Swiss-Prot record:
Its main location: membrane. This is Carnitine transport permease protein OpuCD. It comes from Listeria monocytogenes serotype 1/2a (strain 10403S). The keyword Cell membrane applies. The chain crosses the membrane at residues 27-47, 63-83, 87-107, 148-168, 182-202. The complex is composed of two ATP-binding proteins (OpuCA), two transmembrane proteins (OpuCB and OpuCD) and a solute-binding protein (OpuCC).
């Protein structure tokens, strides 16, 4: 009960500070995922057509994913210095694999009969991609973005070690305090809530975009 009271008191006293770090934390995570999506989605579409290249590209993304977060930040800090840019770049790198792999999988799993139907109707490669492949793969791609954002929110917590702030800053303050359990929770709870909300919201978007649950428009309507 004492911890709960201290937690409530902390929020009442430092509410604006917690909200500021909450939004900073979210924006770092969101920017990292957005930049990764800008690169990974076109790259995933490209390697879906280049089977030999796909293995190498996905393997490189896998290797990046296995690098410990603190080690990644330490290396990037030597190159870019302290601050949010270092964290955003590390989140960008960690977000590449789920988005890239899901884009590749989504495009590869499109029914070949639909592709042939589109070509038979005189569609160009760009039209086939825009009107058939991307709509059918969109829910799978969104699942990758969803996973990437949840991962990014967790990893962003250690951004405090390179002076980027975020909710990790509150958690570290708690670990340095003599009786800092309430302060640790003050940073950990919003981090968990953010990850859960991101997962639920993007999960809903993913289900909405699922072509199996939506009536497919005839190709003639799409044209």
């Amino acid at each position: 009960m004492d911890t709960l009271k201290q937690l409530i008191d902390y929020y009442q006293t430092n509410g604006s500070y917690v909200m500021e770090e909450f939004w900073r934390h979210f924006l770092m995570s969101a920017y990292g995922v957005i930049f990764a999506a800008i690169i990974a989605i076109p790259l995933g579409v490209y390697i879906a057509r280049k089977k030999r290249l796909a293995g190498w590209v996905i393997q490189i993304a896998n290797i990046i994913q296995t690098i410990p977060a603190l080690a990644m930040l330490a290396v990037l800090m030597l190159i870019m210095g302290l601050g949010t840019n270092t964290v955003v770049l590390s989140l960008f790198l960690y977000s590449l694999l789920p988005i890239l792999k899901n884009t590749y999988t989504g495009i590869r799993n499109v029914d070949g009969a639909l592709l042939e139907s589109g070509k038979a109707m005189g569609m160009t490669k760009w039209q086939v991609l825009r009107l058939i492949e991307m709509p059918l793969a969109l829910s799978v791609i969104m699942a990758g973005i969803r996973n990437a954002l949840v991962i990014a929110i967790g990893v962003a917590a250690i951004g405090t070690f390179v002076g980027a702030g975020g909710l990790g800053d509150i958690i570290v303050r708690g670990t340095n305090a003599t009786n800092g359990t309430a302060i640790i929770l003050a940073g950990a709870i919003p981090t968990a809530v953010m990850a859960i909300l991101a997962d639920v919201l993007l999960g809903w978007v993913e289900r909405t975009l699922n072509p199996v649950k939506n009536k497919r428009k005839p190709l003639t309507e799409a044209l």
